[in-house]
């Protein structure tokens, strides 16, 4: 394809067909656009950070191996304690896309129900990943984490602020304010608050059940010295290797994603039906189940203004 497009193959970036998209950040697929955006000197530091964790993962003893320890923690939480979800909570707005990315890396890799040999797993594997930057999450779903379901949490903090603000008269600067929450939340989860403590604080009797925190809720904290390209590379590699460790322990293939295929295949059938209905006026076939047939019929009835054979039409902006 490169040659047909008129580009010398020697000027093309190689990419192995066995590398899944979720693991391609450090390949040419990720490095090229990142280099165009930030410059290769920055991306090189990112790669060096990822490589440092690769080396650590391959050489450090298990008891000091960060991805191994984190992977084993996840296996313990999921398969032994029965906690199906994990919250990824970075206390930095610059990491707002970390949780959605790790969500794909983790759930697409380890969302499997059979072993690598094709046998049904006799235990639960994989975890539901979600998250938001710290204070955003505190005012949306932390309520559930503290007093609802038990959800193991990954807290990620940064020592040095990217945007420090110092205001005269303030008790602490903006970053210390943020990090106060970072340090406090794991303690709140771990130790909670008992009815006896609340009574000592003269809390109304009828409010005590509502203000009680059970504690004993698992979390881990990662504290980065700074948030630069090198540390981001390290952080990404830690999570990638962690996911692989979980897959190794569960005996599953963390590098395929057959679960994506069925939906795509069924979507192709729907696409053919939509084309036939719009161009030829054909009714929805009996091959669809009753629910889908009903929804498709309603959808087509409500979109009769869609042209059957349009010229190129773009939205007006």
From Swiss-Prot:
Pfam families xref list: PGI
Listed under GO cellular component are:
cytosol
- An individual GO BP term: gluconeogenesis
Write out the catalysed reaction: alpha-D-glucose 6-phosphate = beta-D-fructose 6-phosphate
Its EC top class is: isomerase
The compartments listed are: Cytoplasm
EC number in record: 5.3.1.9
Q: In which pathway does it act?
A: Carbohydrate degradation; glycolysis; D-glyceraldehyde 3-phosphate and glycerone phosphate from D-glucose: step 2/4
* Superkingdom assignment: Eukaryota
Q: Does the keyword Isomerase apply?
A: yes
The UniProt entry, under PANTHER family, shows: GLUCOSE-6-PHOSPHATE ISOMERASE (PTHR11469:SF1)
Q: What is this protein called?
A: Glucose-6-phosphate isomerase, cytosolic 2B
What species is this protein from? Clarkia lewisii (Farewell-to-spring)
